[in-house]
C-alpha cells in the first residue's frame, strides 16, 4: 500500500515535469522552435483547431519557421490566428506558405524572459510540493486507520521526501538550462 502512494506521487511529479517542459518550449529563445506554435489555434471550418493539426511546421533556418497548410484554403485563417496570437512575430504569407522570422532578442527581453522562466519553474515546484503534501496526508490517513505502523509511516515520509527532493532538483536543472539558453547571445 505504501508503494502505491509513492508510485502515484512519482507519476504526478513526472506529469509536472512534462508540463513544465511544454511551458518552457513555448518561451521563445531567439531560435526557431516548432513548440512556439503549440498554443496557436485556428478557426478552421467553424472549429478551433490546433495549428499543428492543419499544417506542417518546419524549420528551414535557425530563426525561421515555415508553416505549410495541408489545405491551401486555410492559409488566410492561419495567418489571422498567428496575427492574433501573443507571439510578437509577424507572419509573411507568400501565397502557399507562411514564414515566421524569429527576431533576435534584446538584452532586456532576455532578462524579462529569464524572470518568466524562474516564475514558471517556481510554480512547478509549488505543484510538486502540493503533490508531496497530498502523499503525506494519504500516508497519515493509512497510519490512523492502522493500515501501516508508525515506523512504516516514518519510512514512507522519508521516501516521499526523497522523491520530492529529486523532482525539485530536476525542476531546478530544467529552469537553469532554459535560463542559460535564453541569456546566451
UniProtKB/Swiss-Prot annotation:
The UniProt record lists the keyword Cytoplasm: yes
Alphabetical keyword list: Cytoplasm, Protein biosynthesis
InterPro entries: Ribosome_recyc_fac (IPR002661), Ribosome_recyc_fac_dom (IPR023584), RRF_sf (IPR036191)
GO biological process: translational termination
GO annotation, cellular component aspect: cytoplasm
UniProt keyword Cytoplasm, yes or no: yes
Alphabetized GO MF terms: ribosomal large subunit binding
Subcellular location field: Cytoplasm
SUPFAM superfamilies to which the protein is assigned, alphabetical: Ribosome recycling factor, RRF
Pfam family of the protein (one): RRF
Role of this protein: Responsible for the release of ribosomes from messenger RNA at the termination of protein biosynthesis. May increase the efficiency of translation by recycling ribosomes from one round of translation to another.
Protein family (similarity comment): Belongs to the RRF family.
Protein name: Ribosome-recycling factor
Amino acid at each position: 500500500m505504501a508503494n502505491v502512494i509513492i508510485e502515484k506521487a512519482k507519476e504526478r511529479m513526472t506529469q509536472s515535469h512534462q508540463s513544465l517542459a511544454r511551458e518552457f518550449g513555448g518561451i521563445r529563445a531567439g531560435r526557431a522552435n516548432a513548440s512556439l506554435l503549440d498554443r496557436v489555434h485556428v478557426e478552421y471550418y467553424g472549429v478551433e483547431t490546433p495549428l499543428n493539426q492543419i499544417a506542417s511546421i518546419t524549420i528551414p533556418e535557425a530563426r525561421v519557421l515555415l508553416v505549410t497548410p495541408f489545405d491551401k484554403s486555410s492559409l488566410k485563417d492561419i495567418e489571422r490566428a498567428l496575427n492574433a496570437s501573443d507571439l510578437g512575430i509577424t507572419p509573411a504569407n507568400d501565397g502557399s506558405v507562411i514564414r515566421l522570422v524569429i527576431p533576435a532578442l534584446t538584452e532586456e527581453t532576455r532578462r524579462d524572459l529569464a524572470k518568466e522562466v524562474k516564475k514558471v519553474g517556481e510554480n512547478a515546484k509549488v505543484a510538486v510540493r502540493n503533490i508531496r503534501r497530498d502523499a503525506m496526508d494519504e500516508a497519515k490517513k493509512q497510519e490512523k486507520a492502522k493500515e501501516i505502523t508508525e515506523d512504516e509511516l516514518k519510512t514512507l515520509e522519508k521516501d516521499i521526501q526523497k522523491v520530492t527532493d529529486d523532482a525539485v532538483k530536476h525542476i531546478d536543472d530544467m529552469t537553469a538550462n532554459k535560463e542559460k539558453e535564453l541569456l546566451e547571445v
